[in-house]
Amino acid sequence: MTIIELLKALLLGFIEGMTEFAPVSSTGHMIIVDDMWLQTTDFLGKYSANTFKIVIQLGSILAVIVVFWKRLFSLIGLYKIEGEHDASGTHKLKLRHVLIGLLPAAVLGLLFEDFIDENLFSIDTVIIGLAAGAILMIAADKLGPKEPKTTSLDQISYRQAALVGLFQCISLWPGFSRSGSTISGGVFLGMNHRTAADFTFIMAVPIMFGASALSLVKNWEYINVGDLGFYVVGFIASFGFALLSIRFFLKLINKIKLVPFAIYRLVLAAVLAVIVYM
């Protein structure tokens, strides 16, 4: 394992950590950077490179667990959050809300996993996803309720959870972004941006962990002991930068909303289109 290869692992971990939960599409960025520049398959091999991407995604998931551990543990009865729920308990966020929200994308992902992997992971589809996702985000900011009524996780209804879950299905198209799709959906449904983001991140833990764990089991045989340093550097970088990204994003999202991210996506899509098609 050379210094250059370790620096590539650090860079990919940085990209994964900074983009996984921002509404800019981490998958899109990984495809762009890796396929057009770093090309980890050249020195890791196709299957080992895929395993590496799974490992660094687990780093990002761990960062979400660290940030939301109280809420996540409360959902499974291992921690009690005092004084943060409605007195009636009618709208207290439950594990059922999360399961309802993640079910549509989980089912579609399992049904169409092979089709998506074989047909949608390309620069062309990423460009489309970046642009279309940007339009959705701008529409959410401009057309969503001006005074959202759902301003905390404990006010989310089952109906809202289910509909946000349908919005999450859009993110199966590379470049759309899971957080971009679900936060936009939440805003359309009357959530403020922070509440939609909180629900997005909490909902991401089981679906991302499950998908990553399943993929890791499938690709376990392709892990090369000689590449462990590459995996470790990528995992640590992804975890650290995701932790910073999540905290920063949650502090700002109610103020800046989605339009700045949408503009970035449109610019990136345009630049990629020029590079690829001109």
Curated annotation (Swiss-Prot):
Assigned EC number: 3.6.1.27
Main location group: membrane
GO biological process: cell wall organization; peptidoglycan biosynthetic process; regulation of cell shape; response to antibiotic
Gene Ontology CC entries for this record: plasma membrane
Record-stated family: Belongs to the UppP family.
Chain's role: Catalyzes the dephosphorylation of undecaprenyl diphosphate (UPP). Confers resistance to bacitracin.
Note: Bacitracin is thought to be involved in the inhibition of peptidoglycan synthesis by sequestering undecaprenyl diphosphate, thereby reducing the pool of lipid carrier available.
Name of the molecule in the record: Undecaprenyl-diphosphatase
Organism ancestry: Bacteria, Bacillati, Bacillota, Bacilli, Bacillales
